[in-house]
């Protein structure tokens, strides 16, 4: 295990050095460079489990970043942190903001669906079948969109949609 960790640390460090070199020579505005640096530092903090620090960096990046795709990616990473921290409602809101910035992020839809499906399973365990069906239907709705954006990328979700009877034939076209 230590060898894998050393290799991963080496790869992370090498990537950081290469990325910094590219950012320095790229003909982009200082504001965009700073946004990227905050994003990169947020990613590093997130990978190290320093979620509070990562959120600080991501928020700084969002203040500077104008590119919608990059903003969407930053928001998606923030939503992942909220999800990891058990802040499901905040995570959903942040995923939705990410999708407003960049609607072509199937992983955001997938993760929203995971939260809905989890809530459905919880309702089922508590014997509330109406709530279960509501949450499962919501999961199916967002997962269907994810599968359309990334066909074949979420086979487990496609299987769930089929076996739960919540798929529509056009998902697979």
From Swiss-Prot:
Residue spans of the TPR repeats: 35-68, 72-105, 120-153
GO cellular component labels: plasma membrane-derived thylakoid membrane
Any one GO biological process: photosynthesis
Keyword DNA-binding: no
InterPro entries: PSI_Ycf3_assembly, TPR-like_helical_dom_sf, TPR_rpt, Ycf3/AcsC/BcsC/TPR_MFPF
Keywords from the UniProt entry: Membrane, Photosynthesis, Repeat, Thylakoid, TPR repeat
Transmembrane segments: none
NCBIfam families assigned: PRK02603.1 (NF002725)
Family to which the UniProt record says this protein belongs: Belongs to the Ycf3 family.
Protein's UniProt name: Photosystem I assembly protein Ycf3
Organism of derivation: Prochlorococcus marinus subsp. pastoris (strain CCMP1986 / NIES-2087 / MED4)
